[in-house]
Amino acid sequence: IEIAYFDRGPIMEDELITGGYWSVYYYEGAIYGTEITRGLDILKLIPSEYLSENEIAAAALAYPMIGHRRAFNPQQQVPMDWPASPEVARAYIDQLLRDKAIDEDTADQIIEKLDQVKIEMEMGGNNRLARQINRFSSSVEGLNADVQTKSRLERLDATLKGISESLRK
């Protein structure tokens, strides 16, 4: 999926010198582009109307589903996964809000609980908070929504369940 357009312009104004990117990959919060003539470009994403700060934070948490979590070779095209974390849940909430698939009150209630997770995890967990977060689980059965919205709701649900499970003492 294209999320941005980037062009540095001609290498020389008056002479044809070919160049361009061999490859561009996202890894741990940065976009790495290997340009044929100029070398390596490293770009950071910034929030905009199309991409929230929460989505950027969640993207930085992605890890390979196969093998070591920090080993990454884009040529292997290993599928990526995300941990069940408040950052990931907030990213799904931002996407659902942007698409008007959930109401702001529900989003605020979930975020209020997510704000407590880190502290409670550092203290060894909290069964009560786990139950409260688990109550937000949603069913997409019979929901009149497109495939992408249903997928985001299912992933938010799975993420909230994972957070809830990690909070249990």
Set out the residue ranges of the language-model regions.
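Feature marking well-ordered beta-strand scaffolds used for ligand recognition
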Residues: 1-96
